Regions:
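Ubiquitin-like/PB1-type beta-grasp interaction modules and other compact soluble beta-rich domains
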Residues: 1-69
Length: 70
């Protein structure tokens, strides 16, 4: 069994494989990448870096979704 990292996403504790990156987290949560901003350990990560940014054990991730309206 692959090692799992315990990660906090928007205040909720979750497990992800130790090889998971930010793009994997967004995909696992079934979010549209074009409509979210991701912060890792209080630092905003640009979308083009998500796939190369691994999610370490104990990481804190905040994801903000953009919604249209008027």
């Amino acid at each position: 069994m692959a090692k799992q990292n315990r990660v906090t996403v928007n205040g909720e504790s979750r497990n992800f494989p130790e090889t998971a990156n930010l793009a994997d987290v967004v995909r696992e949560l079934k979010l549209e990448p074009e409509r979210v901003a991701v912060e890792l350990n209080r630092t905003i990560v640009k979308r083009d870096l998500w796939a190369s940014t691994l999610v370490a054990d104990g990481a804190e991730i905040e994801i903000v979704q953009f919604v249209g309206g008027g």
